[in-house]
Structures are given as C-alpha cells and as structure tokens.
C-alpha cells in the first residue's frame, strides 16, 4: 500500500502518466457479474486500500506506482459495440479495476460512449464510483431498464477521506 502523509492537511500531488492505447477486447467475462468493461487501465482516484493496485500494476507493465498512470483505451466504445453484437445478454460491470468516472473521463468520455453502446443493446449495467461526474450521464442512466449505480462513501471526515481516496470527489460534492 502507498504511504500516507504524516500531516492529514498535506495535499498529495502526483505526476500522472497518461497513455492513449487501442484495445483488442473490452467486454470480458467476470466472476462477479457476467461481464466487465474497463475503458481505462489505472486510476486517478488512487484509493490506498484498492484491491486493483495489488495486481493491476503487474499486468499493465507500468513502472509508475498505482495512481500515477492511466492507459486510455481510445477505441473502447467501438470495440464494445462489435463485441456486444455477439455477446449473450448479461450484466456488465463498469469498471472492475478503476473508477469509470475518474477525472480523465471528463475529457475522454469513454464511459459515456460505452454506456451508449450498452443502452442501444439494453444490457443491464452495474456502476460503482466515488465521483460526482456520474451525474453528467443521468440522461443515459435513466434510459436503462436495468441499472445499478453505487457510490462509496468511506468516511464522513473529509481529511481522512483525502488520505485514503485522494482523487475521489469530496463528500460535500
């Protein structure tokens, strides 16, 4: 796990390495839901306790610590659209190893564009996030027949929250 700052008021600044990549596959079998979709590898939210930080770095090939890199799978929506044509209907978890609404999503809109593909085929969706950016997509989310959107709030103390989830939206947001 990443070390915590000694002073809870200390702001953590990290350099973020962003790499735009192309995905061969985006709709993958999951042991939790039927499928998972991860338009990003890496996560700016950088939760200190996240299970993904323990194994994703090994699979990503990055030398940077977890929370300091994000690979943006630029063709995620297009690849997903093709895969959905052949897929058996099932619940899709967006995203199993990152927050689908991490700050870069505001620029790239990959989660939003993937949601459009899933909506067109009416696949059930499950989203877990710590970001207020999910509100941007309410127009799409309300169109699904089957959808779950969960928000994780670890603590009501903003200072402690920033220690453990430095890139998450504030509790007030």
Describe the role of every protein-language-model region.
Residues 4-8:
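Intrinsic disorder/low-complexity segments
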Residues 9-43, 53-91:
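N-terminal [4Fe-4S]-dependent radical SAM core
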Residues 47-50:
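The canonical Cys-X-X-Cys-His
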Residues 75-173:
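Conserved AdoMet/S-adenosylmethionine-binding subsite of the radical SAM
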């Amino acid at each position: 796990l990443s070390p915590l700052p000694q002073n809870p008021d200390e702001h953590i600044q990290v350099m973020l390495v962003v790499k735009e990549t192309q995905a061969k596959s985006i709709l993958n079998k999951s042991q939790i839901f039927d499928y998972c979709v991860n338009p990003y590898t890496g996560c700016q939210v950088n939760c200190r306790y996240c299970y993904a930080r323990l194994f994703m770095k090994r699979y990503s090939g990055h030398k940077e610590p977890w929370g300091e890199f994000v690979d943006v799978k630029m063709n995620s929506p297009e690849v997903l659209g093709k895969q959905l044509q052949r897929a058996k209907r099932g619940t899709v978890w967006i995203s199993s190893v990152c927050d689908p609404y991490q700050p870069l999503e505001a620029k790239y809109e990959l989660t939003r564009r993937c949601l459009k593909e899933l909506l067109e085929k009416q696949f059930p969706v499950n989203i877990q996030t710590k970001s207020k950016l999910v509100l941007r997509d309410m127009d799409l989310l309300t169109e699904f027949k089957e959808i779950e959107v969960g928000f994780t709030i670890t603590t009501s103390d903003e200072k402690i929250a920033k220690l453990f989830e430095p890139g998450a939206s504030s509790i007030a947001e």
